[in-house]
Amino acid sequence: MKNLYTWVAALLFVTLAISVMACTSASSAGTVTVVDRPDIHAVNTNYMGYRAPLRPLNFIKLPVGSIRPEGWVRKFLELQRDGLTGHLGEISAWLEKDDNAWLTTGGDHGWEEVPYWLKGYSSLAYILNDPKMIEETKYWIEGVFASRQPDGYFGPVNERNGKRELWAQMIMLWCLQSYYEYSQDQRVIDLMTNYFKWQMTVPDDRLLEDFWENSRGGDNIISIYWLYSPYGRCFFARIGRKDSSQHCGLDSVDLFA
């Protein structure tokens, strides 16, 4: 019996030694480099970042749905789907579809509130590849497409000081971008292009004039740059400068101090 214990102990020692040697060999084969910030000069051949003359992104956002979560991450996303995020439409007055401003011309509720919810809901649908949620998302997205006007404007007409406010549209543009990443639906590009062409017709002193839309003007610029990068049309750069000049006229300290 004593000899058996000796052999077992020896076998465990040899196994442990081999494991340590393997780990040491694996760690010595690789190197770790610490940098202040990522290299922005290398070209990513898989995903597009910002096009010049925009400053390259430190990290390129992956298209929504390109990563399929597993394990505890997926479990938490499923809890969101089965909880308030996935069922908010059943209890929220803002998501009531009858007379909703995103589904009905002249609707009386659901301006910025709808895209606030839809941005997270739709991304969750794409990531989980949930057919029911994707169908619900598509219902709202089709409502957005149906709201397009001949001059390029889309969505609810919420007038302040005699002009159309752009706050709710800024948020819905994010929803459309996520939808495009998932579906490659060309209607998104057409809608956004025509919408920003309409913005170019708005006099500078009337663009982003209201406090809230001016506060969110940077959100508008992000959507412009998202559209500019794959196509490189000078028009997008011009509208970006136009929006930036109007948005940056209000000190961020005044907004958030």
Language-model-detected regions and their locations in the chain:
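Bacterial N-terminal signal peptides
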Residues: A9-V20
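Glycan-recognition and catalytic cores of secretory/periplasmic carbohydrate-active enzymes
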Residues: S27-A257
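Bacterial N-terminal signal peptides that target proteins for export
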Residues: M1-L11
